Curated annotation (Swiss-Prot):
Organism, as annotated: Sordaria araneosa
Keyword Membrane: yes
Protein name: Cytochrome P450 monooxygenase sdnH
Family note: Belongs to the cytochrome P450 family.
First-level EC class: oxidoreductase
Biological processes, Gene Ontology terms: antibiotic biosynthetic process
Membrane-protein topology: Multi-pass membrane protein
TM ranges: 25-45, 340-360
Location relative to the cell: Membrane
Pfam families in alphabetical order: p450
An annotated GO cellular component: membrane
Length: 542
């Protein structure tokens, strides 16, 4: 009876409540007050009671991610600021912990708390502890949201699910299979070389950035779906593709901190996305391209059961695999297509843009490269040499390594050890904590790379090569989640540069109206991007 009377009394009170008696200002004030109290409690917890409280670093970063969002969206230079944070808090770390650590004048201070939930370590020797193979420990990630790629291999949070999704493609994207399939790269090389020959002497600058982006887009299209979109054969090498990919990259900092923008735009019709958020339209185009080709491949695989010979592509492999049927639905494969087309196109093209600029800008580098390519490219008119032969040209290898180093994979990359605590310098990092390292700081460490901002291929050719150089160079990351497309990226870079800069061809390239600022990466959009008003890489074919 007591309980019934309480309910009756409550019902009577509720009946007396009228919306007319509610003051909107009081409601707004109550909500604001509750949010303020919650925020204060959250900050106090993060600064005083969080498991990462004892790690060095700025209190502002430990309290909130809003500062990083501000820097990413306004100044685009958080990696440089992170380097300064290491320099400042490293002195305290070394003094308090009494640990002797090799220090560089710029990147000192090996461990800092870089967000409320994340630890950043600036020590290349710790790289393979964090980016571990499955034999060492399992690794999760914090997946990006808002890109429409949440179900792709690269964005899969769980270690076990990542391995399940990746296993069918490890063989397809492995070095042996790329070597076996490199005839498709040779075919595109012929298209590229013939196009350059046809442009000789017309006096019109060629956008090499568009050339490289279209080349890599065609190769990725063939690998993914067995069919090239023929971007390289489009008018002026399809500059719309380059503009779309670069435009999509510009929205990444927004989606990094406000993924809801991407999630909302994915539900909008195409015309509305183009009108309201034009930079995100690039992701929509990638999704549409992927959806159309997946439907075609799905039909081909179905026909194989009727005795019709099918093609060979990433999606043929996935649809033929023993993956659960839930992993073969179009929505997930479309996420894979979007991720593969984006990640497989621009980073490789950006490296080619960067390396080609420095070769064209320095006659000594170009002359030496041509001389060293003389033998391996001698029979190019009859046969495009294999990637394995071209990569033996040490100076070309040095140019590509230097380009990958300077391209500056800006964004720090984090891994989460799910099963074990990690120990570094007297600190125990609890399992489940995101721990990140920055290829940027490893690639730009002046102790390892003197004059780190300069393009110096010869640094890789000295007899007493510092072993730390190869240790620090990690453009494709490492461990069980390393870049699945790195072998095709290497093959394209070697063969394209060898073709364009081989001696005794019937055309030459001359740098057009552009300078270093048009190619040098200064914006942190996951990978380094040149200034937004860049003129691109222009060259005359003479």
């Amino acid at each position: 009876m007591a309980l019934a009377s309480i309910f009756a009394e409550f019902k009577g009170l509720a009946a007396g409540v009228s919306l007319d008696n509610i003051n909107p200002l009081y409601v707004a004030g109550g909500i604001l007050g509750a949010f303020t109290v919650y925020s204060i409690i959250l900050v106090v917890y993060r600064l005083r009671f969080h498991p990462l409280t004892g790690f060095p670093g700025p209190k502002l970063l430990a309290a909130t991610t809003w500062y990083e969002a501000y820097v990413d969206l306004i100044h685009h230079d958080f990696p440089e600021r992170l380097a300064k944070i290491h320099e400042k808090y490293g002195r305290d770390f070394l003094t308090i912990k009494l640990i002797v650590v090799p220090r560089s004048p710029r990147f000192s201070g090996p461990i800092v708390r870089v967000s409320p939930h994340e630890i950043h370590v600036n020590d290349a020797e710790f790289f393979h502890t964090v980016f571990a193979t499955e034999a060492k420990h399992r690794t999760n990630i914090i997946p990006p949201r808002g890109l429409g790629q949440e179900d792709s291999i690269g964005s899969t949070r769980s270690h076990d699910m990542h391995q399940l999704r990746r296993k069918p493609l490890d063989k397809f994207m492995g070095q042996r299979n790329i070597v076996r399939q490199q005839s498709m790269i040779h075919e595109e090389i012929r298209v590229l070389d013939q196009a350059m020959t046809s442009l000789k002497g017309n006096g019109k600058p060629v956008r090499l950035d568009c050339v490289f982006t279209s080349f890599t887009g065609d190769i990725v299209g063939r690998l993914a779906c067995g069919e090239a979109p023929q971007l390289l054969q489009g008018k002026d090498f399809t500059p719309e593709w380059y503009d779309m990919i670069r435009g999509a990259a510009r929205i990444i900092p927004v989606l990094r901190h406000f993924p809801q923008v991407g999630e909302i735009t994915q539900k909008m019709p195409n015309w509305l996305v183009q009108a309201l958020v034009p930079r995100s339209a690039g992701f929509r185009v990638l999704q549409m391209l992927g959806a159309e080709r997946i439907a075609r491949v799905r039909a081909e695989v179905a026909d194989e059961k009727k005795g019709v010979e099918g093609g060979e592509s990433m999606f043929h492999y996935l649809l033929r695999s023993d993956l659960p049927e839930s992993e073969k639905i179009s929505a997930r494969l479309n996420a894979e297509a979007t991720s593969f087309m984006g990640a497989g196109t621009y980073p490789t093209a950006a490296t080619l843009i960067f390396v080609a600029y420095y070769i064209l800008a320095d006659p000594k580098i170009e002359a030496r490269l041509k001389n060293d390519l003389k033998d391996v490219m001698a029979n190019f008119d009859d046969e495009v040499p294999n990637w394995e032969k071209v990569e033996q040209v040490e100076y070309l290898q040095a140019c590509i390594k230097e380009g990958l180093r300077l391209l500056r994979l800006f964004r720090r990359k984090a891994r989460i050890a799910t099963d074990i605590d990690l120990t570094y310098g007297g600190y125990v990092i609890p399992k489940g904590t995101p721990v990140s390292l920055s290829p940027y700081t490893m690639h730009m460490d002046p102790d390892v790379f003197p004059e780190p901002t300069k393009f110096k291929p010869e640094r890789w050719l000295v007899e007493d090569l510092d072993p730390r150089m190869n240790r620090n160079l990690n453009p494709f990351l490492a461990g069980s989640r390393n870049c699945i497309g790195m072998h095709v990226a290497w093959a394209q870079m070697y063969l394209i540069l060898a073709t364009l800069f081989r001696p005794n061809k019937n055309y030459s390239l001359k740098l057009g109206e552009c300078d270093e600022s048009d190619v040098y990466p200064v914006v942190d959009n996951e990978f380094g991007v040149a200034k937004y008003d860049s003129r691109g890489l222009n060259a005359l074919v003479v």
